[in-house]
Amino acid sequence: MNLKLLHIFLLSTGGTLLLCTPLIHTTELVNGLVIGKMCWFHLVMLFFSVCVFFVVLTKRTTAIAFLSSDLLLLIFTGTVLITYKWSLNPEPEKLIFIGQLVIFWFLLRYILTAYREFNFFFLFVGILTGLVEAVWGMQQLHGHAYSNHSLFRLTGSFFNPGPYSGYLAVVLPVGLWMALRFQKGMRCFGYICVGAILIVLPAGMSRSAWMAAVVACGWVYWAERIGWEKTKAVYRRNKNATIPFIAIVAILVGCAIAELYGLKRDSADGRLLMWKVTGKAIAGHPVTGTGLGGFPEAYAEMQGQYFGTEEATDKEKLVAGCPEYAFNEYLQIGLEQGIGGLIVFGAWLGSMVYYGIRNRQHGAAGGVLALAVFAVSSYPLQLPSFWVALVFLGAICVTKDGTQIRSSALSVSSACHITIISLLSLASVCLFILQKGQYEVYKRWGWMQTVYNNKAYESVSEDYKDLHDKLKHKPEFLFEEAQCLSKTGQHAEAIRVLERAKRLSGDPMIRYMIAKNRQTLGDYRETEEELLQAIGILPERLYPYYLLAKLYAEPEFYQADKLRAAAGAVLTKEPKVESTAIREMREEVKKIIEKK
């Protein structure tokens, strides 16, 4: 076989498998829709890095331009490492994943420079994954395929319609670009992809994805069919109509935003509250940030402080929650990596779009733009699928066709690029070895959850202890471990585990569990303090008031006035959703009051 053909076969296979990351779903793992994709990415990266290493050893040397995008990525990665809380180590898996992404970026930059045909090939495969997702969604809507969420019929290979719609919105402008740029077969394929996505996208009911799709597709159409010259010509001919036209467009955009806001008003109000609280939290950590994985704890703390002021409204308290993500990637990066990290990340995205325009890669630039818009009101960068898509699209944007290098770019000499690629490939192998046991760990946790959900706590308690060191960064695991400890009478140990979970998550159930264990041990003052803190963070939840009522009814801690106040809250506050649990709590509180 011709050596070049072998290179192309190996690299195209590796790239295709990486682009298929969003389609992976491993049911035997806990959170297999995310962890399964991450494990797949690491496995394929091992193959891909070995292939690139083989290519670089057997191919004539190719000089690579070191661009501002490469430098910005390295600076942002350095910022993540510097701000990370190594003592707590809240996101070890994400750190390894980020390391692989950086390596992937530079390996991809090399092969796109060496083989210009991969620019189009990878975009084609990316569009194909979007088409597969769209058809998958159609099958789910018609009941021919199972959804991954009990409340939604449409999820594709994701766990809810939000990220699914976001991924389609990222692929859509790339498909439109193909339909506009090429002829015959490729144009037909592009329109088929666009049509399939447009059929499914409205059903996802994701306003963020709709906005991303409209902005990115509008830009791609303008870049391919209109451009600056035609725009300037139209402007010169219709100068007097420019201001009225802009005013009309602004009014239409405002009406569209208002309509989207009214579509899911409570959801929109909840996100506005998240952004406000996150903004206040950023003001408390403007330079150093909280570090990767520090968002949930910092958010919960700031929300408690905010609700303690007169500025907070009753409506905000009603829609409040304790989210894992900020539903705005820029705010979350600003909180976790500081304002400096946010500026660097924004510059990195901007540089991709800039180079994409300069290199006439409007499809890839449109995909990056769609992801950037979607990230304003969602959480795409918390999922591996979007990072893989971003790296592919970004690398295609910044890599100029062929091996020519502009004088303004720093060129990595052919003498040292073999060493650099070799070191990157070796680093990728090392990162794979670091995480290779995670698949079995999550598989075992999945089995343990089955036993746990059947309430066989004693049977599985030792298994949770065995996996503690490997999964102590997962608050869900720590909560389950603490529940097993609590049910087997090990309350002090359960509290120790939950205190760590509290630093990793804003989930109020963790605080409630700490309070229940402290009450069992007779630490009534600490129990009261924990519950009052939980109420401060989420003042409209009924459960902490119910726990307070039971606490104040304890003979050793009986306080009649506080008992009546807590009971009154349980009986009078309106829950978000009526349920059997609410009715049972109210009945029990009534009995407690009658006895006292």
Residue ranges and their predicted role:
Residues 477, 510-511, 544, 580:
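TPR alpha-solenoid repeat register
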Residues 454, 488, 521, 555-557:
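Structural motif corresponding to the intra-repeat A-B loop/turn of tetratricopeptide repeats
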Residues 8-24, 42-54, 77-85, 92-110, ...:
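Alpha-helical transmembrane segments of multi-pass inner-membrane proteins
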Residues 153-154, 213-217, 233-236, 245-286, ...:
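Flexible juxtamembrane loops connecting transmembrane helices in multi-pass membrane enzymes
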